[in-house]
Amino acid sequence: MSDRSARLQALQNALKERILILDGGMGTMIQSYRLEEHDYRGTRFADWPSDVKGNNDLLLLSRPDVIAAIEKAYLDAGADILETNTFNATQISQADYGMESLVYELNVEGARIARQVADAKTLETPDKPRFVAGVLGPTSRTCSISPDVNDPGYRNVTFDELVENYIEATRGLIEGGADLILIETIFDTLNAKAAIFAVQQVFEEDAVELPIMISGTITDASGRTLSGQTTEAFWNSVRHAKPISVGLNCALGAKDLRPYLEELSTKADTHVSAHPNAGLPNAFGEYDETPAEMAAVVEEFAASGFLNIIGGCSGTTPGHIQAIAEAVAKYKPREIPEIAKACRLSGLEPFTIDGQSLFVNVGERTNITGSAKFARLIREENYTEALEVALQQVEAGAQVIDINMDEGMLDSQAAMVRFLNMIAGEPDISRVPIMIDSSKGEVIEAGLKCIQGKGIVNSISMKEGVEQFKHHARLCKRYGAAVVVMAFDEVGQADTAARKKEICKRSYDILVNEVGFPPEDIIFDPNIFAVATGIEEHNNYAVDFIEACAYIRDHLPHALTSGGVSNVSFSFRGNNPVREAIHSVFLFHAISNGLTMGIVNAGLLEI
């Protein structure tokens, strides 16, 4: 067993035994040293062309003694886990100082210094090993929010750029000796999803895997992140990372953090962490909450069973950490709850589909192939009016909206990205999950890079063979999306009940047993075909679909079902009263036999 493996086993053991202590504010302690420009420059950067004071990460290279002393003080105060001083060690953040070329070195040194300090403390107290969390900060840019109020579809950073930044930082942290990766101070969940994607890519490419800690930031009394998500929606969006812990930090003091931490402690099937500020800043931007005051609030968290890991953020000092460590020492760590399997989606708000859920309406009018009005607006690049179509679907009761931009004369990828970016700026629409609908893999992936919530991909299938099917499934899993799986294989679409059952069973086994895809995130579409076509072989299409739904419900545990409801009445196009009547009768029987959701014109159904 390697040293790192032994430490990780010790970490797992410690989490079972007690509430672990994270360190406190690094910036707060650096300020106490009253460092000047020459301290930040040191000898190496004496002639740097721009001011560097305030670039706290640079102290890893110019004043490593200061960083090591602060980290030692936190360990002496009772901390179990040190956070590396790498909060801004990405190319995006270091560009403010023209120091992008130092990023890899900063991450290596950040982890190496913390590793040395932690190992020295472990030698003093072998029965209490210390650990290093390699920090990935949020950067100074947001992938979900436009910095230009006049152009809500504009972004000053892309998902791919963030991934590139985080890959470099992650590799440096691992080389330097980090035990865990901590993605923290998440104010935009899409940034965090990019970090998760990058970290998992490094794990896969470099044949190494460390536990991931995730910590979001509730920015104010609204109980939401800066990008608008609630606590539960945030958790649903990042849960695919299977983190060793999820928590909240920064922006709020412990007292104000309480309701959101309590909610997280009941929803998360992993360890829960918190590192709040020392209260709220005063008029001078300083934090006044004393160690005793903060420890009293945190002790109540521990007594209430909310905590597995606790530390401090802005304004906290070794004094705060010592008081907190002493206050929680007598309490058992929170027990991880058993959370029932369910499809847990999110937009700005959570949306759960389980055995008790009513039929889910997926709004179909934002599909360029199904709405002439929407198609015209997109072709004219009138995205503002196109948003009204989406809003009407949500207001009419759509709990998910299906977005499809597949049209021969359109740049489908650009249209998908633009529309999704604009939706992100409309909370009345973006509160619901998104279904990204395309037959083109590149359009689906471009769409996944735009949504901070947990959405649905529509669709994947075995049409191009099993290996391609598994590739698409793994990619969707990496992005944290649920998937619609069509009853379609190398031979063609399933058109009989027997074929529908056979293909769905085969797809399910491959996804669950070979890809490791969560069964609750699999949504089968057993193909709704038109009836009343005048062709005898088509007469049983609706019944075959309903029979397949019942089979999936009864034989493929936790999987869901969906379908394009308007297909069944296609023979009657132009006769809306007849079509609506057919839809209602069809849905009555399909839902009774297990149909979970349908792509419908929300508001025009009578069930």
UniProtKB/Swiss-Prot annotation:
Cite the binding residues for Zn(2+): C250, C313
Q: Per its UniProt record, what Gene3D superfamilies does this chain match? A: Dihydropteroate synthase-like (3.20.20.20), Homocysteine-binding-like domain (3.20.20.330)
Q: In which pathway does it act?
A: Amino-acid biosynthesis; L-methionine biosynthesis via de novo pathway; L-methionine from L-homocysteine (MetH route): step 1/1
- The answer to keyword Transcription applying to this record is no
Q: What is its EC number?
A: 2.1.1.13
Q: Which cofactor does it need?
A: methylcob(III)alamin; Zn(2+)
Give residue ranges for domain Hcy-binding.
Answer: 8-328
One of the GO BP terms on file? methylation
Q: Which GO terms describe its molecular function?
A: cobalamin binding; metal ion binding; methionine synthase activity
> The Pterin-binding domain covers which part of the protein?
359-607
> What InterPro entries does this protein map onto?
Dihydropteroate_synth-like_sf, HCY_dom, HCY_dom_sf, Met_Synthase/Corrinoid, Pterin-binding_dom
Q: Which reaction does it catalyse?
A: (6S)-5-methyl-5,6,7,8-tetrahydrofolate + L-homocysteine = (6S)-5,6,7,8-tetrahydrofolate + L-methionine
Q: Enzyme group, top EC level?
A: transferase
| Domain of life of the organism encoding this protein | Bacteria
What Pfam families does this protein's entry cite?
A: Pterin_bind (PF00809), S-methyl_trans (PF02574)
Q: Which UniProt keywords apply?
A: Amino-acid biosynthesis, Cobalamin, Cobalt, Metal-binding, Methionine biosynthesis, Methyltransferase, S-adenosyl-L-methionine, Transferase, Zinc
Q: Which GO terms describe its cellular component?
A: cytosol
The record describes how the cofactor is bound as: Binds 1 zinc ion per subunit.
Which family, according to UniProt?
Belongs to the vitamin-B12 dependent methionine synthase family.
A further note on this protein reads: L-homocysteine is bound via the zinc atom.
Which PANTHER family does the record match to this protein? Answer: METHIONINE SYNTHASE
Describe its function: Catalyzes the transfer of a methyl group from methyl-cobalamin to homocysteine, yielding enzyme-bound cob(I)alamin and methionine. Subsequently, remethylates the cofactor using methyltetrahydrofolate.
Copy the domain comment: Modular enzyme with four functionally distinct domains. The isolated Hcy-binding domain catalyzes methyl transfer from free methylcobalamin to homocysteine. The Hcy-binding domain in association with the pterin-binding domain catalyzes the methylation of cob(I)alamin by methyltetrahydrofolate and the methylation of homocysteine. The B12-binding domain binds the cofactor. The AdoMet activation domain binds S-adenosyl-L-methionine. Under aerobic conditions cob(I)alamin can be converted to inactive cob(II)alamin.
Q: What is this protein called?
A: Methionine synthase
**Record organism:** Pseudomonas putida (Arthrobacter siderocapsulatus)
The lineage is: Bacteria, Pseudomonadati, Pseudomonadota, Gammaproteobacteria, Pseudomonadales
